[in-house]
């Protein structure tokens, strides 16, 4: 009788606590697994972050975790482990969950990292030690596929090297040139060494030949270097050499060779040792309160010493930029100002309405478009400074409204690269801004079964690709069965599709987008209007 009264009393207290608004709690359980092998991952760090607090623990030998007494409501589970990647190959995997009476166990899948090991072999008995090896990865940046450096290692005493912690993708390896360390006399016309080598071997650094690494894959490569004669190359430089002088020599695959500056009585120039082949010498100078200087010189080495009369280093002049606003509604002018120092005095001016990012079409390096008011010009007159000659993709970012068009002469920079000649020669850049933006109301199509409490909500990643020449592309925006409103979209016709995982698209390459032809929907966004979209999730194709 007493036991029954105590049980009734205990139940009554819990019922009374729930009636009085005390929080309900539930256990959150799950497993962390390898996304490739589906095996459990032990000692993965799992964190649960709720509305007011967070807690962490390591998984057991079966990859399991359990957080007791978690308050009902929304929270996020995060998992990480050295040697693995999470969402979009970041360090953590994040999963939003809803804690409630119907909560189920969760599975967190981490992607294993790949590894490249290799061996450098040289002729005869040389072990190939202390050779610099550069790892390049094919990255996507602003819709462009670019080969960019990832890491550098030196071979050990046996000529071996290792690159670990690699995310899936395409890679290449290159070695630096090396020359025998003996010091030649002034009249020596040849030295021996090893020119750069690449793996896989190819003639074009942007060709398709690459080393593909899948999740968790371990690859071993062998690279053989060939002993080759190097010949002295001298390039005379006209004009005064400034303290901020630099020079490099590149072969046809954009691999750099060392070059040194020499200063003699009435002569100055570059000195280098190169094997037979075709090259380009790039010379740059930087001085305070002066525009940068630039020059390039093509070289051909044919099994003999070379002496070239180098080019004159020309100052890089600014490019005129016109920004015209065709706004149909008032804008909020915050009155922000930029303060800079010019010739020892303070200059105050409003910020530009557009930020420009220039991406080299040859090596993928970024340069910020330093816009400043054109002296004596009106509010629409600007200058793009300190951009060296070359070919660049231009990505504009409007601070208000959107970029309706961006051109340079007859070149549409939303479609084609900007070409800057010697001395910064380029047609003026014309930018038109508008603010009659559209809004997209979007949600996923669902069967309705996934909306029950405790179940993970379906989600996808929305991509909007303009079917007209535009610098605007929306990608990797998470959407769910709940309506999301996406404002500030330039009006026009778009190809809309939602993928089951987030990935960057090579959207400037029509061939890379062929896999998504016929998937998703074609929608039209009207100026100042709202477009409603219900869309299905489609599988993401393998990385291009």
Task: Specify the residue positions occupied by each region the protein language model found.
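Long luminal/extracellular ectodomains of secretory-pathway precursor proteins
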Residues: 1-544
